[in-house]
Amino acid sequence: MASPFSGALQLTDLDDFIGPSQSCIKPVTVAKKPGSGIAKIHIEDDGSYFQVNPDGRSQKLEKAKVSLNDCLACSGCVTSAETILITQQSHEELRKVLDANKVAAPGQQRLVVVSVSPQSRASLAARFQLDSTDTARKLTSFFKKIGVHFVFDTAFARNFSLLESQKEFVQRFREQANSREALPMLASACPGWICYAEKTHGNFILPYISTARSPQQVMGSLIKDFFAQQQLLTPDKIYHVTVMPCYDKKLEASRPDFFNQEYQTRDVDCVLTTGEVFRLLEEEGVSLSELEPVPLDGLTRSVSAEEPTSHRGGGSGGYLEHVFRHAAQELFGIHVADVTYQPMRNKDFQEVTLEREGQVLLRFAVAYGFRNIQNLVQKLKRGRCPYHYVEVMACPSGCLNGGGQLKAPDTEGRELLQQVERLYSMVRTEAPEDAPGVQELYQHWLQGEDSERASHLLHTQYHAVEKINSGLSIRW
């Protein structure tokens, strides 16, 4: 089975696909009852299993269930989890929710919200030969025609992710004398990188990774907490869909850390890749260029919905550039007008330095693609990593080249990427500190920038995945 996931998680060409119901090495814990003795297993005609005790009493046995979370927390394979994700998070699932809304009784409908990433918007703009602003408005028009209630831009959520990353770096820099694991701080927005770190390097690498949530998951907090309150709804009454450049975002949305136990709902219910949205357009017989534009929705009255916005610093969110500028000013009182990148081994590994009187004060880097990530990890393990901060992304060339982006039917890949980069950069940029509505939400929704509530809703944690050495994992 060919996997549609990005190359970030496919470290070899080996296809380890197993159907979730066929074989699995996940051990199941069974509580042993004292003095239970020997029992027999009886199989009924319908395939159900009964335990027959020595005293003649029988008890139906529960089937062992392997959930998506079990798959994600297991180092046995990757593709089983991918298979489940493809069925649980697809444009067909969105269709089901929209169709259910059409026949639901008043008050039983779910509010459907779609949050679109700037990278996906740029990819669609290149395909339909539109600019990014027109694409955003026409995409809003399309979603609302098929039954979606609100369409937002995830760039607004990225303001919070960038601001939290900035603050966290400054705090770590000031604490580096007391902690060997404070620096380098590694960016946390890429789920392919996070999955690799948790499963391959575990407790060694995780302390270095920023705890700031990615824009997708900040958007999840905004929609299922702030926006739900504004709409006088509980989180489970909202169906939240994100449109992302990468299949690995489906893995991120499925993490238990982003699941609301009280209301039994995820912060992001469904992740669609750019390609899946294009497929949805095709199935509906709609060309984006022919639709009438409709303004995006704003999360608050102070947030303008007239046009989409973005940030400086490249197509992966600009984490290095924003953290670098903030740290230079906050730690050394130096205003940085332009950030100059110095290519190192290749175009996907570049350095940025802050110097004063010949002394290097800050040394940052971008590391895109697993070859560069592996080199970075090896430097860390040898204690020879010279960097204070690294913007890490699993995909070569970063998020604009994500595995879920549209491929060119008649254009060379590099040429298409350049076109997508150009369209992405044409959108008006703003500093996260100055973005309308951000400080308002920090005060009224999060109860302050350094509050426990802000920490809970804007940060996350990571979990080392213990490798299971089991004979059951050997395929003879």
From Swiss-Prot:
One of its GO terms (molecular function) is metal ion binding. The modification N-acetylalanine is found at residue 2. The keyword Metal-binding applies. [4Fe-4S] cluster 1 binds at residues 24, 71, 74, 77. Keywords: 4Fe-4S, Acetylation, Iron, Iron-sulfur, Metal-binding. GO terms for cellular component: cytosolic [4Fe-4S] assembly targeting complex. It comes from the Eukaryota. [4Fe-4S] cluster 2 binds at residues 190, 246, 395, 399. Gene3D superfamilies: 3.40.50.1780, Fe-only Hydrogenase (Larger Subunit), Chain L, domain 3. GO terms for biological process: hematopoietic progenitor cell differentiation; intracellular oxygen homeostasis; iron-sulfur cluster assembly; regulation of gene expression; response to hypoxia. Component of the cytosolic iron-sulfur protein assembly (CIA) complex, a multiprotein complex that mediates the incorporation of iron-sulfur cluster into extramitochondrial Fe/S proteins. Seems to negatively regulate the level of HIF1A expression, although this effect could be indirect. PANTHER family: NITRATE, FORMATE, IRON DEHYDROGENASE. Belongs to the NARF family. External component of the CIA complex. In the CIA complex, interacts directly with CIAO1 and MMS19. This is Cytosolic iron-sulfur assembly component 3. The gene is Ciao3.
